[in-house]
């Protein structure tokens, strides 16, 4: 009788498929994966401890460095937590501006994430280059309003640092004219791709029950058939004024997570259309002038605020002792939580599938390790 022996191998911490310094200790029997242990910590930067030393405002640019693809969303979530804690009101126009930036970030994130995932599958780079083309247009707009392409540091307590003007609105409308063609081309090229179907269908299945048990969120949860989106379940900013759907999958495999992200880009487009149409004039201002940004002190208490980031639920938990810094500062990072389900997604599949499954979760190590 033929006997096989299990073998332990390391993938990472420096490996092109891990998209950052992340190590997987993998146990295989032949080419079949038996066990997987994720090893974190290579990018630890003491983020939460620094958040308890910095003033509230000083901590804003540090949030840019969590999910560095989505600094606008990070800023929004942190600003909401401080505003909740300090009882700060946000002008209506600023709420709309934040939503516009968040939805542009969602399109940017999903376009590049799916491009990278197809590269991991051994497909081609065309999809990634298409995504990068749209990403460049969005980053140019971010640079115009914030002065930076990626580390935007754009939100302030009670609003945003700079208003959007006619040029921005014109460029946004130009971008949106081309987005439907990009979505159609992307879908038409890829959904019938033999490489995508072979490498994604019935691979990395995460059943609904396991998804809920692991508390995963975002496209990973919705890909498993759970129609949960914070923008619908607990509307913040002005999301309750927009009509949009929550796309879900049926199987919970890599392919479903791919489809959910494509559908979410279309829903973000719908939200942007409505936001432009409803955007209030500049009369109410883009920031609350009563807020003392540099010397802000929150009354003693605690607050938790969350947003639907492109990767899932991004939350900030703050405890105040009445001083100008947080007594306790905690980040609920979706990449970290979603990554906890990786082992169950991978068991029983080929070691070659691990790279694809990891890519379908869409992690950024900046918010995994912190």
UniProtKB/Swiss-Prot annotation:
Localization (cell): Cell membrane
Record-level Gene Ontology MF annotations: NAD binding; NADH:ubiquinone reductase (non-electrogenic) activity; quinone binding
One GO cellular component, as annotated: plasma membrane
Primary subcellular site in the record, as a coarse category: membrane
UniProt subunit comment: NDH-1 is composed of 14 different subunits. Subunits NuoB, C, D, E, F, and G constitute the peripheral sector of the complex.
Function description: NDH-1 shuttles electrons from NADH, via FMN and iron-sulfur (Fe-S) centers, to quinones in the respiratory chain. The immediate electron acceptor for the enzyme in this species is believed to be ubiquinone. Couples the redox reaction to proton translocation (for every two electrons transferred, four hydrogen ions are translocated across the cytoplasmic membrane), and thus conserves the redox energy in a proton gradient.
Protein name according to UniProt: NADH-quinone oxidoreductase subunit D 2
Taxonomic source organism: Herpetosiphon aurantiacus (strain ATCC 23779 / DSM 785 / 114-95)
Gene: nuoD2
